[in-house]
Amino acid sequence: MSLSHLYRDGEGRIDDDDDERENFEITDWDLQNEFNPNRQRHWQTKEEATYGVWAERDSDDERPSFGGKRARDYSAPVNFISAGLKKGAAEEAELEDSDDEEKPVKQDDFPKDFGPRKLKTGGNFKPSQKGFAGGTKSFMDFGSWERHTKGIGQKLLQKMGYVPGRGLGKNAQGIINPIEAKQRKGKGAVGAYGSERTTQSMQDFPVVDSEEEAEEEFQKELSQWRKDPSGSKKKPKYSYKTVEELKAKGRISKKLTAPQKELSQVKVIDMTGREQKVYYSYSQISHKHNVPDDGLPLQSQQLPQSGKEAKAPGFALPELEHNLQLLIDLTEQEIIQNDRQLQYERDMVVNLFHELEKMTEVLDHEERVISNLSKVLEMVEECERRMQPDCSNPLTLDECARIFETLQDKYYEEYRMSDRVDLAVAIVYPLMKEYFKEWDPLRDCTYGTEIISKWKSLLENDQLLSHGGQDLSADAFHRLIWEVWMPFVRNIVTQWQPRNCDPMVDFLDSWVHIIPVWILDNILDQLIFPKLQKEVENWNPLTDTVPIHSWIHPWLPLMQARLEPLYSPIRSKLSSALQKWHPSDSSAKLILQPWKDVFTPGSWEAFMVKNIVPKLGMCLGELVINPHQQHMDAFYWVIDWEGMISVSSLVGLLEKHFFPKWLQVLCSWLSNSPNYEEITKWYLGWKSMFSDQVLAHPSVKDKFNEALDIMNRAVSSNVGAYMQPGARENIAYLTHTERRKDFQYEAMQERREAENMAQRGIGVAASSVPMNFKDLIETKAEEHNIVFMPVIGKRHEGKQLYTFGRIVIYIDRGVVFVQGEKTWVPTSLQSLIDMAK
């Protein structure tokens, strides 16, 4: 902001002299800038408050400013103010308001307030300061002062390629002469006296300013100091809307939009005018004309304006303005509607073009389908013609298979969508019945397997297979097996003898991967099992020469858990046959041994404890131990059952019926001056009769250690007058040897257990990757020595069945289901392991 107001006189003019005089009366400038927050304020100092106008001002206390007041120069000559008349502020305001239009003002017509002020140099201004304004001093002697100093700047510049009299830079593009300064004529602002560019500037930067742009900028700056920047009269401004703007606007005038249904019948009372008016919809208000009231004066009809903007009302025609505005709105609406209609038609053309392309594709597809269906129909009609009895070239099963393969390969979509069941029933079934008419399954079990396998790939419905369905009306292959193949099997099973099981087992093994699972289940449950059950009821273990396991066990891979109901009557009949059995009869072991791995461990142990162990205990109790004449038959009869009965049961028999008598005989022998070498051989001979598994049992080990202790006590005592030479040493050596063998055996067992644990740890580390539930069950089965394998050709609701020991299970979403009596029961993994053991 300019500080020229500080130099104004009482009426706002700038005083020409340099006298620091300030008037205290209120001027027009003070009134106009009363509410101007940006005006320069002078804060009164303490000295001014004390002394008033007589206060002296130091140069240090002056306020900083842009142009600033200079300190009074007492050395300058005295300047006098020329007398004259000046106009008042009111007359100047009248002259400003009298201008109707803005006229170009030349720079010479500027008010004196905005012109440059001449410097009051006075007589003492040093003339030497004027010399540098020209700035034309030669540059050749640049840096000549270094001749009288120790500076090396000139030398460094010359080493870097500087040539005196030329510009700096690689290409000497720098300026040679210093930047010239130009003295402004007066004290005005920058640009007040025209261009201030020097000759050097014009040469270095030859840019010519446009006079029109300069004039426009000048007029713009000129209008800023007027009281009314817009002028007393404004030219009317017109706003034009292009069609593109209306399209971008994209809406219809609110006055012309259709009213909403819920607001179309609303009663509205208008009290904005002189009289109260009633409208029956908001749309009527929108169509109300801006007609002035007749009785009101013209001044009251105009909107109130405040301040200086309130002007006299002009010529107004509300009806005409309304009609013109209505025409404008209708035109805009028509333009927008036409644009929308055009866009809609273009979109419709694009949509119809896409529809045409789609319909063309559909038409081509339908033509291909019609062509393919025609070819398929020709092939079917050819098959039907060759199926007639009087045809000279009858259709064979191999040719029919080739026709179906062609349909499946070349016309898969039509073949998949067609009714394969009806087609196969009409063409394939008669040929298949003719093919199997002379077939005997027990003599030629593999007859027709290749043909049926080929037709399985042609007719089986994969979707029903994945869902585990057995709908005969939807699967042609299942219906073929059930209606054509199954009657031959039923017929042969009714004539089959269960004791001759090998031909039937071979037949089913050959077809188990071909026939559907539910048909195999039907054969095993409804045809085979009843025959076996009836034969088991008629079996007598005392009279039948053929062992029962020879015609029951071959069915285990196919039937597995289905044979569980037969085990109970078999055990009952075997128990009845063993009532009068003696351990000397080895035939019982031959009959029972094949059933050890078939029965569950619990049922087998219970059967042994009930029927075999008492007989063995009675036989062992009849054993007579005589070192001089020993009969070992009874002992051998008992020891032969070691693999059949558990180790704990055998050790119990030895503790109860053998070791008491054996230790008693040893004590009696030692008390009669024995030969210790014979006792040693006798001891080692009996110990060799037992297996390592029995000797490792703690009870058996304790009994033999007790015998060694008895022998050591007998040797160490002084009983008897005669002592065999070396007997004590021999017995001590024997004791040491036997104890060392026990320690070695225990160490070997511990080492084996450690190796097993290490291998198990390696397996766990290797299997640390994420596994599924089936892999976890398999790992647990390996740890507990339980057989875990899938059942071939067996599924339940599409899930694969597995055998876990003697239990049939299946896995569904991480849950194990065990086959119960009637339903499948979910169980935990630990319970499954316990049941399998």
Curated annotation (Swiss-Prot):
Q: Where is the G-patch domain?
A: 149-195
Name the InterPro entries on file. Answer: G_patch_dom, GCFC_dom, STIP/TFIP11_N, TFP11, TFP11/STIP/Ntr1
Acidic residues bias: start-end ranges: 91-102
A molecular function GO annotation: nucleic acid binding
Give the record's GO biological process terms: biomineral tissue development; negative regulation of protein-containing complex assembly; spliceosomal complex disassembly
What GO CC annotations are associated with the protein? catalytic step 2 spliceosome; chromosome, telomeric region; cytoplasm; extracellular matrix; nuclear speck; nucleolus; spliceosomal complex; U2-type post-mRNA release spliceosomal complex
Modified-residue entries (Phosphoserine), positions: S2, S59, S98, S144, S210
Task: Give me the ranges of the annotated region Required for interaction with DHX15.
Answer: 1-50
Family designation: Belongs to the TFP11/STIP family.
Please name the PANTHER family in this protein's record: TUFTELIN-INTERACTING PROTEIN 11 (PTHR23329:SF1), TUFTELIN-INTERACTING PROTEIN 11-RELATED (PTHR23329)
**Name assigned to this protein:** Tuftelin-interacting protein 11
Per the UniProt entry, what species is this protein from, by scientific name? Pan troglodytes (Chimpanzee)
Source species taxonomy: Eukaryota, Metazoa, Chordata, Craniata, Vertebrata
